[in-house]
UniProtKB/Swiss-Prot annotation:
Encoding gene (name): rnhB
Cofactor: how bound: Manganese or magnesium. Binds 1 divalent metal ion per monomer in the absence of substrate. May bind a second metal ion after substrate binding.
Lineage: Bacteria, Bacillati, Bacillota, Bacilli, Bacillales
Localization per Swiss-Prot or TrEMBL: Cytoplasm
UniProt record, GO biological process: DNA replication, removal of RNA primer; mismatch repair
Residues holding a divalent metal cation: D78, E79, D170
Organism: Geobacillus sp. (strain WCH70)
Protein name according to UniProt: Ribonuclease HII
PANTHER family for the chain: RIBONUCLEASE H2 SUBUNIT A, RIBONUCLEASE HII
């Protein structure tokens, strides 16, 4: 087997999919440590690929059932930003084709930022259509976060073209006529919802990073609007901006205390430590 250099073997392994291939069996017999490392890496990669395929099959079961019923356009819907103290709530609706395969797709919360960004672009390239719905902090204060989330989701659905035949929604029911199913933990159980969770999360993160350039004192590029200790301290020192949700605790209490001429002290900060995320 030494007729091949290690670099050549590395290139050959990238072309082999079956461990029963004659060439692979020949490579396995090569006793050079560097070659054996390449073989071990090949097995690890194939194992990861098989796991990704199994995960895709498991997460595609809702979509498969609908496709088998003759339903053509299925949209997954999810949101990002229900819990933060600042920024909008963003919803996404994503329609994937029947033959879609995006390995590694999962609930956005389980993925690193780099992985989310990579999948974000893969979804954009693969999807039949993507809709984005944004509801501002001011609107959230007017109607409450639950109603604001529904509004964002409906706005996202309305952007889809062609119009969806069926909706798969993460733990929510929408007051629209399109047939739909609410799925608990949908972003971990449906590829369409998982795709929408990534689109929503990355879209919102991009918005918050841009907002951080305008208001660097709040650290939005790191906390994404969540109530970290640094963010709460910045609110105490600099006050709020239009993107802050004044109906959310502890901002609501901080504003009331300021009106009363009271200082938001360390005791209060400790009492709301659970608001960090």
């Amino acid at each position: 087997m030494n007729k091949y250099t290690v670099k050549e073997i590395q290139a050959l392994l990238q072309q082999i999919d079956d461990e029963n291939a004659p060439l692979f069996k020949e490579i396995v017999q090569d006793e050079r440590k560097s070659v054996q490392k390449l073989v071990a890496r090949w097995y690890k990669q194939k194992k990861q690929e098989e796991q990704a395929k199994r995960q895709w099959q498991e997460m595609s079961r809702y979509e498969r059932q609908l496709f088998e019923q003759g339903i053509e356009y299925i949209a997954g819907i999810d949101e990002a930003g229900r819990g933060p103290l600042a920024g909008p709530v963003v919803a996404a609706a994503v329609m994937l084709p029947k033959d879609a395969y995006i390995p590694g797709l999962n609930d956005s919360k389980k993925l690193s930022e780099a992985k989310r960004e990579m999948l974000f672009h893969m979804i954009q390239s693969c999807a039949i259509s993507i809709g984005i719905g944004v509801v501002t902090a001011a609107e959230i204060d007017e109607m409450n976060i639950y109603e604001a989330t529904k509004k964002a989701m409906i706005k996202a659905v309305e952007q889809l073209s062609p119009k969806p035949d069926y909706l798969l929604i993460d733990a929510m029911t929408l007051p629209i006529s399109t047939p739909q199913q609410s799925i608990v933990k949908g972003d971990a159980n449906s590829v369409s919802i998982a795709a929408s969770s990534i689109i929503a999360k990355v879209t919102r993160d991009h918005f918050m990073k841009q907002l951080a350039k305008q208001y660097p004192q709040y650290g939005f590029e790191k906390n994404m609007g969540y109530g970290t200790a640094q963010h709460l301290e910045a609110i105490r020192v600099y006050g709020t901006i239009d993107e802050h949700r004044r109906s959310f605790s502890p901002i609501k209490e901080m504003i009331e205390m300021k009106k009363e001429g009271k200082e938001y002290d360390q005791t209060h900060r400790q009492s709301i430590a659970g608001f960090s995320s």
